[in-house]
């Protein structure tokens, strides 16, 4: 074959490779296995799972944990994972869905048995790393998963404080010279340990043709812990937790957009609390765009409004009192799943409702830059006030377009069990998942 023919073939293959990347973006579906144990309308079945898998390219089972004593990866719900064989039940779906990659995730803020076991793992040296790597590979292989998702539970940025203009000016000065409020004085050492762990873990998994992905949890400072240029070659893809920038647990006294696409300027907001900043950070670190998946949540964050919060609902909302009461399905303070949020929107069934069942006022974002919110001002007694920041199918679709236009790897959905998987709102099952998939096509 002549040199010109070789060159022509090489160029053709390069074009085809680019087309393949752009034509088949990732839709990484996280599955919190706790959903299988919920009751009533919140219970997520294997039938629900199979419907969702029509839209996913990857299914990530959450979550395993780390034994703080010996640094081995282990189940944190042995009754469900092992005794009821739910791990095997989920991975067995590979037979019917061979085009989907099934990964097992470790960490993900679900491993609450020990406060700092992930830092201990990093500091455990080669012997501790080896125990973790061998146990992780064994667990992944034993239950026939295609790889491992590493969702390290590392120290978080300190939340934004509420203060006036003078405090804001001092904060900006302090941040410029000292960074984003240091929470880990050994972060540079830990960054090197993370790099070593990822490289060794990747090498071990590759021996068995297993995948390795990294999930960067919300409010973990990527620049502290991840040497992006060094670890990117060892990772198949990276899921960015680009949501929960503000939550009622971290920011109880004021409510604001929890997952904006772009910076919402003014009012003492921090410039890195948005999807665009986090994505650009990784791109500027020379990480290939097609390895980056942006995260979208299927739930909203909810604050309790008081009489002092006013009645406009316009963020930033002052004088909130932490998390709003839990929803009837999700049963977690400060959080409502998409079906619960949708049920609070004005509809024939709640027109005359009062108290906690009264409808909320929905405020859309026509710019698609910051996100939608909904609220119910507190009544004359100061009760039943509610403020919700959320993504809906429209804004999720817009974020998927963000990924597509920038030639990113795709989207990671957190998670399937918080979507309206029963179609309670509009009879459309998995509306968030579908909206993202259709935009990525």
Swiss-Prot record:
Repeat listed as a keyword: no
Post-translational modification: Glycosylated.
Broad class of the protein's primary localization: secreted
Pfam families xref list: Glyco_hydro_18
GO cellular component, one term: extracellular region
Additional free-text comment from the UniProt record: Lacks the typical Glu active site in position 153 that is replaced by a Gln residue, preventing the hydrolase activity. Its precise function remains unclear.
Name recorded for this polypeptide: Chitinase-like protein Idgf3
Source species: Drosophila yakuba (Fruit fly)
């Amino acid at each position: 074959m002549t040199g010109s023919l070789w060159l022509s073939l090489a160029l053709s293959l390069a074009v085809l490779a680019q087309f393949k990347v752009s034509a088949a973006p990732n839709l990484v579906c996280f599955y919190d296995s706790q959903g299988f144990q919920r009751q009533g309308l919140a219970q997520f079945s294997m039938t629900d799972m199979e419907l969702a898998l029509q839209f996913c390219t990857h299914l990530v089972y959450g979550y395993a944990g780390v034994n703080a004593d010996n640094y081995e990866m282990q189940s944190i719900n042995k009754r469900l994972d092992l005794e009821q064989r739910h791990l095997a039940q989920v991975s067995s779906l590979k037979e019917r869905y061979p085009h989907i990659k099934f990964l097992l995730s470790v960490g993900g803020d679900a491993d609450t048995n020990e406060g700092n076991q992930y830092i201990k793992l990093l500091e455990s040296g080669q012997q501790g790393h080896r125990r973790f790597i061998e146990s992780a590979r064994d667990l992944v292989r034993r239950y026939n998963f295609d790889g491992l998702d590493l969702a390290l539970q590392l120290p978080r940025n300190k939340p934004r404080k509420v203060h006036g203009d003078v405090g804001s000016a001092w904060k900006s000065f302090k941040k410029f010279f000292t960074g984003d409020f240091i929470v880990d004085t050994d972060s540079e050492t830990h960054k090197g340990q993370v790099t070593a762990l990822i490289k060794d873990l990747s090498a071990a998994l590759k021996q068995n043709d297993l995948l390795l992905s990294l999930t960067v949890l919300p409010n973990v400072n990527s620049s502290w812990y991840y040497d992006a240029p060094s670890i990117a070659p060892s990772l198949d893809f990276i899921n960015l937790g680009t949501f929960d920038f503000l939550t009622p647990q971290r920011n109880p006294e004021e409510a604001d957009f929890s997952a904006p696409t772009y910076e919402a300027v003014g009012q003492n907001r921090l410039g890195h609390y948005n999807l665009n900043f986090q994505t650009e950070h990784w791109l500027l670190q020379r990480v290939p765009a097609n390895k980056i998946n942006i995260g979208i949540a299927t739930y909203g964050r909810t604050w309790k409004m008081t009489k002092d919060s006013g009645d406009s609902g316009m963020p930033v909302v002052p004088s909130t009192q932490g998390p709003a009461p839990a929803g009837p399905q999700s049963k977690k303070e400060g959080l409502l799943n998409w079906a619960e949020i949708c049920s609070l929107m004005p509809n024939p069934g709640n027109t005359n409702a009062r108290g906690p069942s009264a409808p909320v006022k929905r405020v859309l974002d026509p710019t698609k830059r910051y996100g939608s919110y909904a609220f119910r001002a507190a009544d004359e007694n100061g009760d039943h006030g509610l403020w919700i920041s959320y993504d809906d199918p429209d804004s999720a679709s817009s974020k998927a377009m963000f990924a597509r236009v920038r030639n990113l790897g795709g989207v990671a959905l957190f998670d399937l069990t918080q979507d309206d998987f029963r179609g309670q709102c509009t009879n459309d099952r998995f509306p968030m998942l579908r909206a993202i998939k259709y935009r990525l096509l």
